[in-house]
Amino acid sequence: YDSNSILKEGFDFSDPPMIFECNDMCGCNINSCNNRVVQHGITARTQVYKTYGMGWGVKALVDIPKGGFVCEYVGEIISDAEAEQRENDSYLFDLENRDGDTFCIDANKFGNVTRFINHSCDPNLTPVKVFTAHQDLRFPHIAMFASREIKKGDILGFDYGEKFWVIKHKYFTCWCGLEKCKYSK
């Protein structure tokens, strides 16, 4: 992060690296350390609203700079095996651990504003794995950062990914409406 708590210039939004923030093991000041962004919580103001055709959505109520932290995808952490047993898989976020057990975040019953952010084939948010209190690679925080400048009133969206659409295309298609849409029919 830079001195304004923004991801540094040159951050790779197409293949984001993991971020390890300072924690209680560091000697830094918890209130003034620039490497404690996600753990300070949401600062960008957003609004949940009813969309046309896509249920709920989220829009920005303030300008958000490229690289700015917007929100964290939170919910119940469950194993992939448990996720397979659940009937409603609409709010699952796969944590994609390459080694050992795999888990996901289920925001169906427990979550925040982030669960209402819709898919976009031209996303303005990028999910980034962030570690704050530990370094257990199975359990990252999923932080949403602005992948470009976001203006007040812009609709927030991130790419749900091909794995999501392989499963869901049987039930619905993408409604982003963009010419370069990857997942409509």
Residue ranges with predicted function:
Residues 1-41, 157, 170-185:
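Cys/His-rich Zn2+-coordinating "finger/knuckle" modules used by eukaryotic regulatory proteins
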Residues 3-6, 31-36, 59, 72-73, ...:
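Intrinsically disordered, low-complexity regions enriched in proline, serine, glycine
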Residues 14-25, 34-134:
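Catalytic cores of histone-lysine modification enzymes
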Residues 78-93, 166-184:
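Short, compositionally biased
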Residues 114, 122-123, 128-164:
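C-terminal folded domains that constitute the principal catalytic or ligand-binding module
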